[in-house]
Regions:
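HIT superfamily nucleotide-processing domains
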Residues: 1-107
Length: 107
């Protein structure tokens, strides 16, 4: 197996997971083809498992902070799998665009 999943130490929502490659790479873009495939297969498996276990989950955010200027604080590639639930925020419009609040709303 090329990756493993853990609970995020500082979860954004309940059951927030991290998908982490076993080999140390700083960037998602440094993954080899087999690693890339393995990481994404585990991401999908974890999503399916969470959906099966928790009927309140209605959507997911999937995110990668790649590089210090993106907000990456742990300099080892990892993917966030963040379960979302209806009404967990008052207005989810813009999704990950909320990183830049002024860009959150767009035509």
């Amino acid at each position: 197996m090329f990756a493993f999943a853990i609970d995020d130490k500082y979860p954004v929502t309940k059951n927030h997971k991290l998908i982490i490659p076993r080999r140390h790479v700083r960037s998602f873009f440094e993954l080899g083809n087999a690693e890339y495939k393995g990481v994404l297969e585990l991401l999908k498996k974890e999503k399916e498992e969470l959906s099966r276990k928790d009927a309140t989950i209605s959507a997911f955010n999937v995110g990668i902070n790649d590089g210090k200027d993106s907000g990456q604080t742990i300099i080892h590639c990892h993917i966030h799998l963040i379960p979302r639930r209806k009404d967990d925020v008052s207005d989810p419009t813009g999704g990950v665009r909320g990183v830049f609040p002024e860009k959150r709303k767009y035509p």
